[in-house]
């Protein structure tokens, strides 16, 4: 794909979940499909008919096994936060249909215990998980998502 081809592509609408433990740490998972260190917070596409909150709760269950009764939704980013994929991976991800993602992020307080987290879901996203402070998350993610995560942590700084 040429740079002009990539520039003409749309962004994929997506949600992200900041699952906060109430003690300054957030859930972070190592991507199952990556051989390199690629830690991230739960995220996924918004399906037809879903709003960001509904999609975020669905993604939470799908990726972490955490039941919706074990969280309290606290906040949502007011605007879409966008990121571009590195050009060399655009053709490989989402069949080359998107240049990146436009995300709405939802902050949830985790009300359960670690035993309520089960990443061995029907379609696993993560091979392992841990609680990390936001600064450590920024050190653990792929570089092209760093700016997004900084904006998200800033948006939720009253809690984190």
From Swiss-Prot:
One of the protein's GO biological processes: ribose phosphate metabolic process
Keyword Hydrolase among record annotations: yes
Motif (Nudix box): 44-65
Cofactor(s) the protein needs: a divalent metal cation
Signal peptide (UniProt feature, chain positions): none
PROSITE patterns named among the record's database cross-references: NUDIX, NUDIX_BOX
CDD domains: NUDIX_Ap4A_hydrolase_plant_like
The enzyme's E.C. designation: 3.6.1.-
Domain Nudix hydrolase: residue ranges: 10-154
Keywords, alphabetical: Hydrolase
GO molecular function, one term: guanosine-3',5'-bis(diphosphate) 3'-diphosphatase activity
Pfam families: NUDIX
Family, as annotated: Belongs to the Nudix hydrolase family. RppH subfamily.
Role description: Accelerates the degradation of transcripts by removing pyrophosphate from the 5'-end of triphosphorylated RNA, leading to a more labile monophosphorylated state that can stimulate subsequent ribonuclease cleavage.
Matching HAMAP family: Nudix_RppH
The protein's name: RNA pyrophosphohydrolase
Species of provenance: Dinoroseobacter shibae (strain DSM 16493 / NCIMB 14021 / DFL 12)
